[in-house]
């Protein structure tokens, strides 16, 4: 065999990858018979809207190293690829295309819009899988799955009905995170926070005359209770004032009432452990309809939930007509003016505030009461916690177990419905339902649905449970935890044995990589310039015990030089063996 003098990565890698594909050895069914004991990795399915970024490249390289090592060791290896339908992300992408045409999804209607998304998916949905092939990934492409293919959809429907028949899925009204632009509910894990300069407004709530039995001798009764808030517009929905039970300043006021400014509704003063005595004056407004912590307080004190902000972030409900229909920021200005006019604004203070943003469109999130579908989480969380604590599933590095345990310990029922058009329709909601299922509901079934569940298949018998999950820290709760309890609930065993949490790839300066911020690095450019092997080597070379990576292209250059050395060494050996009497082995 003659090896060219110059190493041309593109020519060599394309030729060798095509030989691998032709051999069929990425498919475990076509491996030699000596490969009996299975070894399985399921690729975390990238969004159909996605293109390869450095995080994908690192994760795919880690998985490929593991799968190739086990294949060489004689294991029956399955590395199963696929993509996620990515409900909100995909819908936002198509809506942007429609906007360029001067249209909205409402102009098309639900069914035509879904047809448009399917057409887009067929055209662009496999781009990232093609890029993974360019990276050299040895997945079994014949088993590629999509989270909305026919068999996968059957699994999602079966899982929903299973939970529903157990009484674990219910429909109810609760405050939820809501995106006014996407017009859908979001989980806490689907929100990004942006710190901004804001204000704290100190508002006087007139005290209802205190009953004589609670007055302390020699103490002058207060006229007002001063409350600090960063969102005065929500005060129209207040149903209580809360203080910490250990706060001596307000001990004699617990159980009394104040008059809600501008509304003139009597609301009680309650004691609750959630109140931070160091925030503002130590007395806080309780607005159960528009704050998730306030909702928790309301459950303990049997407080009403009043809706004063609607799905379009406008004021609504039984409030003075001068505020109704105003956007929240406009209402805030008007309310502050009126409080000043009535002498009920004590002071204003500069304050840094974390603003919740939609993770897809970055619109400011509103918490609003809404009818949604929920999955009870208490029993599922207990199952998952027990299994992880038993040591039957191991996290690497181990410190990431704490993220999982903290979430499971403080678990809340999961809002599984979304008010979008692209996704799995809720099985019992009837034709053309208003809601679809949260994308993570279907993603939670990935280890079992891809192997054939709810049917008993050869793949599920041979390859479940899988061996390794390699993923990122930011989806431990969104995805990893949910796959764990889904595997236990539906298959009776854990879906994987080891969880590798990869480091985050940062810029050389330590900043987050982002194409939109101009700090992203395109792995495809590196592959084109240096080759896939050099890119893989350069990325993996920087991994150090789970610590985040400050990426530098110098390591890819080093990888290229290493590939050259291997090439030249191989060429030298081949030249020498050609001169000798040693026969090459095929």
Language-model features, listed with the residues they occupy:
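N-terminal, positively charged nucleic-acid-binding surface of large information/translation enzymes
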Residues: 1-210, 219-246, 287-300, 304-319, ...
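Conserved active-site neighborhood of enzyme catalytic/cofactor-binding cores
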Residues: 47-81, 96-98, 179-181, 190-206, ...
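Short beta-alpha connecting loops at secondary-structure transitions
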Residues: 104-115, 316-325, 519-524, 548-555
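Short conserved beta-strand and strand-loop elements enriched in small hydrophobics
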Residues: 203-205, 256-262
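A glycine-biased structural micro-motif
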Residues: 252-255, 321-332
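Short beta-strand-centered aromatic/proline hotspots
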Residues: 267-273
